[in-house]
């Protein structure tokens, strides 16, 4: 026994998480007020009703491309954990340099 408790390191150890809410479409987790707050930060005064779904779609495609690149860096380094540097390099590759997280 490794003393890890119920979770264990191997697959199939421990039961299901009891209080985990199942989100079928996670992009809906980006709520209308959250999009509104981001727009306010950008100086937007009024927002059309159709903007919310469009924003979710654009955000989803942007995050998919960044995460895909970050995972590629992680796999190349033969690691299983995506680090902040992987994300920084992925953003830099797409021409969106981010400062303050190393690299």
Swiss-Prot record:
Query: Would the keyword S-adenosyl-L-methionine be found if you checked this record's keyword annotation?
Result: no
UniProt modified residues of type N6-glutaryllysine: 92
What is the role of the protein in this entry?
A: Core component of nucleosome. Nucleosomes wrap and compact DNA into chromatin, limiting DNA accessibility to the cellular machineries which require DNA as a template. Histones thereby play a central role in transcription regulation, DNA repair, DNA replication and chromosomal stability. DNA accessibility is regulated via a complex set of post-translational modifications of histones, also called histone code, and nucleosome remodeling.
Oligomeric and partner information: The nucleosome is a histone octamer containing two molecules each of H2A, H2B, H3 and H4 assembled in one H3-H4 heterotetramer and two H2A-H2B heterodimers. The octamer wraps approximately 147 bp of DNA.
Q: Which residues carry this modification: N6-acetyl-N6-methyllysine?
A: 6, 13
- Similarity-based family: Belongs to the histone H4 family.
What lineage is this protein's organism placed in?
Eukaryota, Fungi, Dikarya, Ascomycota, Pezizomycotina
Recorded GO CC terms: nucleosome; nucleus
* Keyword list, A-Z: Acetylation, Chromosome, DNA-binding, Methylation, Nucleosome core, Nucleus
Question: Mind listing the GO molecular function terms for this protein?
Answer: DNA binding; protein heterodimerization activity; structural constituent of chromatin
Q: Where in the cell is it found?
A: Nucleus; Chromosome
Give the SMART domains listed for this entry: H4
GO terms classed as biological process:
nucleosome assembly
Superkingdom of this entry's organism? Eukaryota
Q: Which residues carry this modification: N6-methyllysine?
A: 6, 9, 13
> What protein does this entry describe?
Histone H4.2
Q: Which residues bind DNA?
A: 17-21
| Chain segments carrying region Disordered | 1-20
């Amino acid at each position: 026994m490794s003393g890890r408790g119920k979770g264990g390191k191997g697959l199939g150890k421990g039961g299901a998480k009891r209080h985990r809410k199942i989100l079928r479409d996670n992009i809906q987790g980006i709520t209308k007020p959250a999009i509104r707050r981001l727009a306010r930060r950008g100086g937007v005064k009024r927002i059309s009703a159709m903007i919310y779904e469009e924003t979710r779609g654009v955000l989803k495609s942007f995050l998919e491309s960044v995460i895909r690149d970050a995972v590629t860096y992680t796999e190349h380094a033969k690691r299983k954990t995506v680090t902040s540097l992987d994300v920084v390099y992925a953003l830099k590759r797409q021409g969106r340099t981010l400062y303050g997280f190393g690299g």
